[in-house]
């Protein structure tokens, strides 16, 4: 079904925005509210619209979403549950902005995020892809572990030329001109790790994303540690389909054991530098070990 603005406000100019912020939602309405609040803080920056794709949630968008159209343009489109890749492609096809920005429902743009991103994009007219800097929410153990993981991961994968061998659609931007006319940027076969599959394509094309450290997005995990572990098991299983495609293309994208050890060492040092304590290190390494175990089991069985 076509996207329809929830509430039309005649005071909002209907011009082509610079950014289209695309969020795919599947039963994440509570988390989305925090994302919307963070976007309301970006209204003094570059023009943007928001496109929310409801990927067949049990309940339709709550009425509280409607109020945001009085602050910035927002459209909601609903589809049958088809997965994150198809949902994001639907968002692309619905959007009108010159630059597509992907965030997750449980992510919150920090103050000045879009302004910093536009400045970087405007200063690099030959570049097409941009990775925003991701941080965790240090309010609890799960958030501190995520903060630690992201610090070490982005530090390790950042290259001297300002590019990063990392792509996470919790905060990723791409020029519309780089996307095919049909709007199918993400491979629909990928139920999970669709962003890693896109990164493999960029690696093959020799076009790694430009890192934008000033444009910050906070990943606000709503799950408990037990919930995260259950999600890790599911994700590791479904991600294998994407990694099988990557391997078939002959692109080396997965981390080596040397990379893993380097990141673990970097995380250990970062626990003191970021004043996070040592316990988050054990949480991150435990979660990564679980994912690796499930992934290895998948390979053996298939």
Residue ranges and their predicted role:
Residues 5, 28-41:
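Short, well-formed alpha-helical segments that are part of the catalytic scaffolds
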Residues 36-78:
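Acidic donor-binding segment of Leloir-type glycosyltransferases
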Residues 79-95:
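Glycine-rich, basic loop-to-helix element that forms the pyrophosphate-binding segment
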Residues 100:
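Short aromatic/hydrophobic "clamp" motif used to bind/position activated sugar donors
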Residues 112-143:
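Conserved donor NDP-sugar-binding/catalytic core segment of glycosyltransferases
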Residues 132-133, 146-165:
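Short, flexible, basic/aromatic active-site loop/helix in glycosyltransferases
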Residues 191-200:
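Acidic donor-binding loop at a coil-to-helix junction in glycosyltransferase catalytic cores
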Residues 231-237, 251-302:
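Non-catalytic, C-terminal membrane-associated alpha-helical segments of glycosyltransferases
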């Amino acid at each position: 079904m076509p996207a329809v603005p929830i509430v039309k406000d005649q005071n909002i100019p209907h011009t082509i925005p610079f950014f289209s912020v695309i969020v795919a939602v599947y039963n994440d309405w509570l988390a989305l509210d925090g994302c919307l609040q963070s976007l309301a803080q970006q209204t003094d920056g570059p023009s943007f619209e928001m496109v929310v794709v409801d990927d067949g949630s049990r309940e339709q968008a709550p009425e509280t979403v409607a109020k945001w159209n009085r602050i910035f343009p927002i459209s909601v489109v609903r589809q049958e549950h088809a997965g994150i890749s198809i949902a994001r492609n639907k968002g692309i096809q619905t959007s009108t902005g010159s630059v597509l920005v992907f965030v997750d429902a449980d992510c919150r743009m920090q103050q000045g995020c879009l302004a910093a991103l536009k400045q970087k994009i405007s200063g690099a007219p030959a570049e097409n892809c941009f990775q925003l800097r991701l941080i965790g929410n240090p309010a609890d153990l799960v958030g501190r572990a995520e903060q630690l993981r992201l610090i070490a991961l982005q530090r390790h994968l950042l290259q001297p030329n300002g590019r990063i061998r990392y792509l996470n659609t919790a905060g990723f931007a791409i020029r519309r001109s780089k996307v095919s006319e049909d709007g199918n940027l993400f491979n629909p076969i990928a139920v999970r790790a669709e962003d890693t599959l896109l990164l493999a394509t960029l690696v093959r094309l020799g076009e790694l994303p430009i890192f934008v450290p000033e444009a910050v997005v906070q990943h606000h995990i709503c799950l408990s540690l037990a919930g995260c572990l259950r999600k890790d098991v599911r994700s590791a299983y479904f991600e294998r389909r994407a990694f099988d495609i990557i391997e078939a293309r002959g692109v080396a994208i997965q981390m080596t054991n040397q990379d893993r050890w380097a990141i673990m060492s970097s995380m250990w040092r970062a626990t003191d530098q970021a004043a996070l304590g040592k316990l988050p290190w054990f949480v991150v390494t435990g979660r990564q070990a679980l994912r690796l175990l499930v992934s290895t089991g998948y390979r053996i069985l298939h």
